[in-house]
């Protein structure tokens, strides 16, 4: 079994070393143009050239959850595309989104500017009801973000291509509900 690693914007060596340690019977290489064909690939933002040269791949494992960029490339129909379903990213994304929403809601940038300027300015507390938050995409990551935001009692709206039902989240689906979703959100 030959595995090749083609990860743009990342160092490929940790992937190569980790895979080689986990699969000592496999040949694991870092892809270079003109390299021998592989059976499997670990990829992130590979160039079209990669798939042109690796037409016999059985599967390409994307190192992130989103595969939209891969689907724009010409890939042999026999090559399976595998994406991460979560791999711990949903918790990180929920933390990041909650931090960003609360930072904006509480006007923390303004308070920090006041601290740097050596002044204190009163800011009227905001009502959460006036800050509906929208989450685009309600897959594994989006659902986790939406659920996390409900804990802070923000009105949460979610949009996805297909209908979903999430406790505490007003779900919108499809192109027909997209404008209504956008107009219901103050923060997206």
List where the protein language model places each region.
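N-terminal glycine-/charge-rich "phosphate-binding" loop or analogous flexible N-terminal tail
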Residues: 1-40
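Phosphate-coordination loops involved in phosphoryl transfer and adenosine-cofactor binding
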Residues: 2, 78, 129-132
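Short, polar loop motifs at secondary-structure junctions
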Residues: 10-13, 31-33, 45-49, 64-68, ...
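Rossmann-fold NAD(P)-dependent oxidoreductase module
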Residues: 18, 96, 100, 144, ...
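Short, structured coil segments at secondary-structure junctions
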Residues: 23-24, 55-56, 75-77, 152, ...
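A short, aliphatic-rich alpha-helical micro-motif
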Residues: 34-36, 51-54, 179-184
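Phosphate/diphosphate ligand-binding glycine-rich loop within oxidoreductases
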Residues: 39-112
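Rossmann-like dinucleotide/phosphate-binding beta-alpha-beta segment
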Residues: 123-188
């Amino acid at each position: 079994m030959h595995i090749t690693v083609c990860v743009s914007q990342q160092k490929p060596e940790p992937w190569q070393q980790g895979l080689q340690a986990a699969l000592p019977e496999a040949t694991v290489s870092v892809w270079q143009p003109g390299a021998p064909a592989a059976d499997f690939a670990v990829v992130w933002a590979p160039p079209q050239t990669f798939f042109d040269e690796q037409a016999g791949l059985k599967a390409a494992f994307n190192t992130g959850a989103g595969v939209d960029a891969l689907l724009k490339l010409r890939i042999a129909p026999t090559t399976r595309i595998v994406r991460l379903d979560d791999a711990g990213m949903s918790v990180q994304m929920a933390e990041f989104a909650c931090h960003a929403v609360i930072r904006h809601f509480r006007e923390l940038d303004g308070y920090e500017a006041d601290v740097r300027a050596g002044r204190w300015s009163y800011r009227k507390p905001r009502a959460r009801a006036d800050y509906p938050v929208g989450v685009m995409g309600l897959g594994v990551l989006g659902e986790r973000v939406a659920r996390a935001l409900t804990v802070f009692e923000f009105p949460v709206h979610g949009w996805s291509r297909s209908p979903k039902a999430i406790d505490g989240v007003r779900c919108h689906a499809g192109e027909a509900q997209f404008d209504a979703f956008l107009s219901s959100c103050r923060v997206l």
